[in-house]
Amino acid sequence: MMGAMQIDRRGLLAGSVASAAALAAPAVAAPLAAQGLDAAQFGVRPGAPDDQTTKLQRAIDRATRARAPLWLAPGVYRAGDLKLGAGAQLIGVRGATRLVLTRGPSLLSAQGGEAITLSGLTLEGGDIPLPQESGLVHLLAVKAVRIADCTLTSANGNAVKLDQCDGDVSRNTMTGAADNALLCVDSRGLVIAGNSIRNSGNGGIRVWQSAKRHDGTIVADNTIEDTAARSGGSGQYGNAINVFRAADVIVRNNVIRRAAFTAVRGNAAGNIQILGNHCFALQETAVYSEFDFEGAVIADNVIDTAENGIAVTNFNDGGRLSTVTGNLVRNVGVRRPDNPPEGAGVGIGVEAETAVTGNVIEVAPNAGIRAGWGPYLRNVTIAGNVVRDAGYGIAVSVVNGAGDASISGNVIAGARLGAIVGMEWHKAVTGDLLKDGAARYPQLTIANNRAR
């Protein structure tokens, strides 16, 4: 056994010389590092005061051709309008590798290709104006995008814009975007998860389609705070999460605080699911499913402090077909100065083909639950809910042309203006239907409710 392991001194010396020669090989001929190619091999220097766009672009192109990640050491790199080819991977040290925009419509962009990865980078916009159709990172028609563990700050426009992309945007921090933190247009099946978004000028996460069609994006486990509406409007801006024309989108388990308008707004968004979100301090309705949509599941959300809680609306434009189940809504009635006071303070409002079941609503100075708006009421059931401390417990439209509603098994406490009251738009036109008068409205079924 010892013979097999006997060491030859001459062989050992020869091996040592060979190892030393390998260590002394010039940098330009260095093999791939464990984490990929080092950008320093191409003359890219962290902390250099000059613009390093040309050197960085050369390094990106070489690494992409080699199908290897490009590694950027800790430090500041000043550059702009860097182009990413198919398979490009830029890897930095989280919180320490900083790319600062100097020029161009974007800091990093790509058109076409697939498998583009950005990881561990801090990308700074430096408040340099960006075109509306671009972003600090702008990817067009890229498959299998991955943006992870990055920080994006001071984008004077959109922080990230994804057009016609699919892939994953996860665990990033986006702060101070003048327009949107993340704008996705005509993309499919994105996973947007675990991001922290703060101080966006017009929107947190926007999932849009240019025409109504399948999207399938999942927006989950994000924290979105302090969303403004710098461009004004009546709800086009100022939403933490906005889904527009995009069908089959799931918005779940997000924590949303302080938005100029809405926590989650689905506009013409068919088959949207809004599940388990925590929504606090909204200046308009906390959760909206509105305009020309068919299909919405709104369940298990916690809403505290908003103008209104949940609105499933615009039957006049085709908005219909939803379930509103298991939500906790409290402390509504905080009114935007530019909105009429009579529209504030509703816990849950619905119009057509909707089941409202198992919700708890507390402190709703207008109405705990409102069913219908003028003639826009059809096939609504309101069952097994608890309403406490409201103006009207349940307000139901009884104008000519309003359709059917079933109101059963609800518990209503402290409804100052009546437990169940018939309405013509904002105006009450009946007494408390729980006590008397319900027989005049055969389209209403009112049974087994309790009030005190």
Where are these regions (language model features)?
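N-terminal secretory signal peptides and thylakoid transit peptides that target proteins
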Residues: M2-A20
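C-terminal segment of N-terminal export signals and the immediately downstream linker at the start
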Residues: P26-Q41
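Acidic Gly/Asp/Thr-rich repetitive segments characteristic of extracellular carbohydrate-active
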Residues: A39-W71
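Extracellular beta-strand-rich solenoid/capping regions of secreted or surface-exposed proteins
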Residues: Q57-R65, Y77-I91, R98-A144, A159-C165, ...
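Extracellular beta-strand/beta-solenoid scaffold signature
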Residues: L101-S109, P129-L139, S154-Q164, G176-S187, ...
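Surface-exposed loop/turn motifs in large extracellular/passenger domains
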Residues: S109-S119, V137-A148, C165-D168, R188-V191, ...
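Core solenoid repeat modules with strong leucine/isoleucine-rich periodicity
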Residues: A229, R252, A268, Q273-L282, ...
